[in-house]
A protein has these predicted regions:
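Recognition helices and adjacent regulatory flanks at domain boundaries
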Residues: 3-4, 17-22, 34, 43
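Short, Lys/Arg-enriched anionic-surface-contact patches
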Residues: 1-12, 54-64
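N-terminal intrinsically disordered/low-complexity leader segments
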Residues: 1-7, 31, 38, 46-52
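A solvent-exposed interaction/effector surface
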Residues: 18, 42-49, 54-62, 66, ...
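A generic structural signal for ordered secondary structure
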Residues: 30-36, 55, 69
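Residue-level marker of regulatory loop/turn positions in helix-turn-helix DNA-binding domains and
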Residues: 5, 9, 22, 37, ...
Length: 289
């Protein structure tokens, strides 16, 4: 495959996924995604499947259900039907059926606390480990829009994360990008999604007029009100931090999450250090209840 062709295909996938995550509360059609990428429906479907190994409709459903699972935990004021609608479901029945198939529990059971059992089945989590985060309070601040170049990774393992960050830094060196802020974007939560299915974005903040090349793409992190948690830890602690934020802090905070992804701004990036320690500010886009 020619380099230009590979770049075009990567851009199609990246533009598509960014669009889905940003508009997950709407009815997203194949026609719409094909128009977005200026290709036929047939070629779009074929390219997305070949590049990601996933069916586009299965991917959209997975993203909808993950967003709903988060909202059921953090939004105590909306009904289950309203949350389903906010995640693109028109029929409460089809939503409940899909949710139970994905997470074992019904939306009602999940909201009443079954999510804690789901998490404990996936991680070695107990009240003692969560107590390490007690007293951790965020700053609430409006964060301006950021422009980033990035690489997307599917399959959340330490080895793969190190490789994708090293490749992004190699690109930065070739483009004479120096001292750019490192940002990790968490479209998929490892709390709810199997490691091998998670999509992670390694990003560098750049000037708005910077144009990437090769398989590197560009995105915008939209302006939003954020809860910002400053934390220093080691590899594996980010997952526990996310559990604390979404399952313990958020329900009592007077805020709720919105559909924009959370992201970490690294002062010390453990994927590029000799040891596995990090320093970061974890940003969670929110709104007042």
């Amino acid at each position: 495959m020619k380099r230009d062709t590979k770049h075009i295909r990567a851009q199609i996938v990246n533009k598509t996924l960014n669009y889905i995550y940003t508009n997950i509360d709407t009815d997203i059609s194949l026609d719409e995604l094909a128009r977005l990428n200026s290709v036929s429906k047939y070629h779009f479907h074929k390219i997305f499947k070949e590049e990601t190994g996933e069916n586009i409709f299965v991917k959209i459903t997975s993203i909808r259900l993950q967003k709903a699972a988060n909202l059921l935990i953090t939004d105590n004021y909306s009904t289950i039907t309203e949350i389903a609608n906010n995640c693109g479901y028109v029929s409460p029945t089809s939503f409940s059926k899909a949710f139970k198939k994905r997470f074992t529990f019904t939306p009602s059971q999940w909201r009443k606390g079954a999510f804690r059992n789901f998490t404990k089945n996936k991680f070695d989590i107990n009240d003692k480990s969560i107590k390490n985060f007690e007293g951790l309070e965020p700053r609430i601040k409006v964060i301006p829009q950021k422009t980033c170049v990035y690489l997307r990774l599917k399959g959340y393992t330490e080895a793969n994360l190190i490789k994708v960050w090293q490749r992004l830094l190699a690109f930065a060196y070739q483009c004479d990008l120096k001292n750019n802020t490192h940002i990790g974007i968490y479209h998929d939560s490892t709390i709810m999604i199997p490691y091998e299915e998670c999509n992670y974005i390694a990003a560098l903040e750049v000037d708005e007029n910077f144009e990437p090349k090769n398989s590197i793409s560009k995105l915008k992190i939209h302006e939003s009100l954020c809860a910002i948690f400053h934390y220093e830890g080691k590899y594996g602690d980010i997952e526990r931090l996310m559990i604390y934020i979404y399952q313990y802090w958020m329900p009592k905070s007077g805020y709720e999450v919105i559909t924009l992804p959370a992201y970490a701004v690294f002062s010390k990036n453990h994927y590029l250090e000799e040891n596995d320690t990090f320093i970061l500010d974890f940003h969670v886009p929110i709104r007042v209840v």
